[in-house]
Amino acid sequence: MAGQMAVLGSAILALLLAGYLAQQYLPMPTPKIIGIDLGTTYCSVGVFLPGTGQVKVIADENGHNSIPSIVSFTERDVYVGYDGLELADSNPQNTIYDAKRFIGKIFSSEELKSESSRYPFKIFNNNGSAEFSVTTNETFHVTPEHIGAQLLLKLKRMAEDSLGMPISKAVISVPAEFDERQRNSTIKAANLAGLNILRVINEPTAAAMAYGLHKADVFNVLVVDLGGGTLDVSLLNKQGGMFLTRAMAGNNKLGGQDFNQRLMLYLYDQLHQMYGSLPTRKEEIHHLRQAVEAVKLNLTVHEAATLRVSLTLPERKLTKEVPESEVKTNTVLKEKPSQKTDLKNFGDTPKVEKNFVKVLFETEISRKLFEMLNKDLFEKILVPIEQVLKEGHLNKAEVDEIVLVGGSTRIPQIRRVIQDFFGKEPNTSVDPDLAVVTGVAIQAGIVGGSWPLQVSAIEIPNKHLQKTNFN
């Protein structure tokens, strides 16, 4: 009997060993649950790869790991992501962005009126909920959920193209401050895009998972999330694999767009000093914005960057002599000058000009100049950091780990400001643009039971928690 049991045990062991060895050579199963970071300025999608334990962030058709959270409506079609961004200056009244600021949120009339003044598109109050007015062949209203659904549908299709199979399940992240209504509205947007949301995870928790802190021996974790339009600071307490958001603070009007605007205003002054005139064509203003963004990114790794952009200026207003060969009549221009005067259009053309001058505007921007232009904005980052420490009854020396999230935390001076405040370097081991989507994808893998199994992050609800905003 004992001999039979030994033989049986050996056979079972052999089968298990054979299965394990065979598993090494079999193709890994395709992940079926995606992780989504639906950000205010950019959004992205990723998957947890069974077997390797790695996360794959899925790129769009042009190789971008994230897409702008922008939807533009025209008479011909609806353009999402980078296609929508291309229309932001030529079709501003029908190009919707920052929809995440409005989703599921109830506004007073005064609050919504104040928010609306910041945007070129029209926002209407529907019993406290925001709706966007769009005019193409006809005028109609779209909800923030509808805008979110368009973005999520784009991400869903990107994942399907990459994985070669239909996708219907996802895990999604939301700001820790989102209440039940905002979370349900985000889920509704996903449902409209054909996605069943299996779990909603807070963005700071997702970021902590991306940094592997759900498996690390740390207790107090500070997450600084600085993106294109918002700053969020969260203090997390970690106990085992459980996360409790202990305090939140931030600035909903501070981000990379504000840093860009400071540089744009500087260039506005430079152009006026050099030529006495400013560009008025929407297409060229859009190119100038793109050049500013490129310079900002360049300055994260270089001490200086050259901005070079071709502009068309009204000849009548020029104060600088230019060769006659550069003067072009307005009949050769494909687009009429904009008549609108504001910082977005950088121009004031009271009448259609007869002649225009094509100039190549070129200037070198140093990192030192960029830091000087934004010095006060960079220092504002410390205000919510100090607030969460105060609310969490913590000394800054008691923070075990500082993690950075969001593309704007790439800026060297921002990292220095945070490092000088805490007296130690923040953790920058994860791409800040992809930290949240990486964490959400890990959580999607856990929900799907993917091997190798990770330690799941369990969030402890803190219903009494409120975010302190410094706008």
Predicted regions and their residues:
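Conserved beta-strand-loop-beta-strand element in the redox core of flavoprotein oxidoreductases
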Residues: 132-134
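Short, basic/glycine-rich phosphate-binding loops at helix/coil junctions
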Residues: 127-129
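Oxyanion-binding/catalytic loops of NTP- or PPi-dependent enzymes
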Residues: 2-114, 122-125, 137-141, 145, ...
